[in-house]
Every structure is written in C-alpha cells, then in structure tokens.
Amino acid sequence: MRILLTNDDGIHAEGLAVLERVARTLSDDVWVVAPETDQSGFAHSLSLSEPLRMRKIDDRHYALRGTPTDCVIMGVRKVMDRPPDLILSGVNSGTNLADDVTYSGTVAGAMEGTLLGIRSIAFSLGYSFVEDIRVVQWETAEVLGPALLKKLVGASLPQGVFLNVNFPRCTPEAVKGTLVTSQGKLVHGLSVEERRDGRGFPYYWLRFGRQESEIRAGTDQAAIRDGYVSVTPLHLDLTAHAVRDRLAKALA
C-alpha cells in the first residue's frame, strides 16, 4: 500500500512524525509532502496567485510553501510517480470537531484527497494546559493509531466520503474506546483585537473563543468530552437535501 501524508502544522510538527510512525505499521511505502510553515486555519484554500516552491528533504520527504491542499495536489500530481492508495492528514495538535472542520487545514488535506478519488483520513488530538503550557499526549495517537488505522482502511466507504478522527486529550490507558459519531455544533465567540504598531497604525488579531453550548449525544464533541476516540464520516456533498422539496414548492 502506498501512503501520502500531509498536515497543517508544518513539516517539522511532532504530530506529523507520529503519523508517519503510525503509517509505517501499515506500509513501508510512505511519502510526506507537508507545508514549510504552520498553515492552521487555512481550510481548503489553494495557492493560485503565487508560485509554489518545494524543498526536497530526501526522496520521500518534501516541504512546500503552500497550504495542505496544495501539498496533496503536489504529492499526487508531481512528487509521486503513481498515485497513493491512501492519504492521511495530521496528527493535528488540537481537536477538529463540529464546525471547526470548516476551518481546518488538517481536514482539508483529507477532503482534497477525497476529491482526487483517494481514500483519505484526517487525524487530530486534543490538548490541555498545565501552568499555561500546552500539553499534548502524543502517545495516545501513537499507541492507539495503528490498530485503528488498520480497521479504518478495511472499512467499506462510498465514493466521496472521508473520515475525521479525533483522539481525546488523555493518556492511552484512559481512553474508553472508539465511537462512530456525527458532526456536532459549536457556538463561536470570535472577536477582533485591535493593536497599534510603532507608527501608531492599527493592526488586528482574530481571537477564537467558545460560548457555552449544549453538546448533543452521539456527536464528536460528546465522544471527546467523555474520553472516547471519535470517528466521524464526512462527505463532499454539501446539499441540504431535506430542504430541496420545500424550496422547490416555494419557488413554484
């Protein structure tokens, strides 16, 4: 099996190294094309207004000045002599749950693979803070990842469906199991912070916040909150099918 890896945290991210070790439990034919710098929050964006520059680290590892979507396209269309059988994106430092999947470069890497007709899976891992220091239990993904990946690769999926996997922020021993979930709903508390540069001109930072919201049973949020690994099948068809007939009647 030939596997292509990417992420949005960048070529030097610990999560990418973890994912490569997990992938190598399945195959030795593993390739990596990942962003040169952190591309978190770039979602499914393409670099169309400037050229892509790629740095070859070795025969199987490449760093690209581009987005995760760019990386998948370059890997499949340029770097590899034949397409991969599987695309894995991650392991992201921080979960990608509910509405956050629309912002996630990690999820977008798997989305692009699916658009190219290749089975794709996104992996993310929760973190906690200890005295304002981010603590990521990477061993949770590394210990549980191989067996889970083998099962997911063996599962039958329809065309246009990819998987979004999230590990909880606990040790491997504390994980209660794996649940197949639906996408939850977040209430964002986005805000804009204005600052001034040395010449007095304003510049701005977008700040993510979270407002209290009800977590529905069976969702990715509920699984992570309760200490389970969440596996959410997502698809590319964004049509609101339940509304079509009603809308057609309104327009008749």
From Swiss-Prot:
It is found in: Cytoplasm. Its EC number is 3.1.3.5. InterPro entries: SurE (IPR030048), SurE-like_Pase/nucleotidase (IPR002828), SurE-like_sf (IPR036523). GO terms for molecular function: 3'-nucleotidase activity; 5'-nucleotidase activity; exopolyphosphatase activity; metal ion binding; nucleotide binding. It catalyses: a ribonucleoside 5'-phosphate + H2O = a ribonucleoside + phosphate. Keywords: Cytoplasm, Hydrolase, Metal-binding, Nucleotide-binding. Binds 1 divalent metal cation per subunit. GO terms for cellular component: cytoplasm. A divalent metal cation binds at residues 8-9, 40, 92. It holds the Pfam family SurE. Signal peptide: none annotated. Its cofactor is a divalent metal cation. NCBIfam families: PRK00346.1-4, surE. Belongs to the SurE nucleotidase family. Nucleotidase that shows phosphatase activity on nucleoside 5'-monophosphates. This is 5'-nucleotidase SurE. It comes from Chelativorans sp. (strain BNC1).
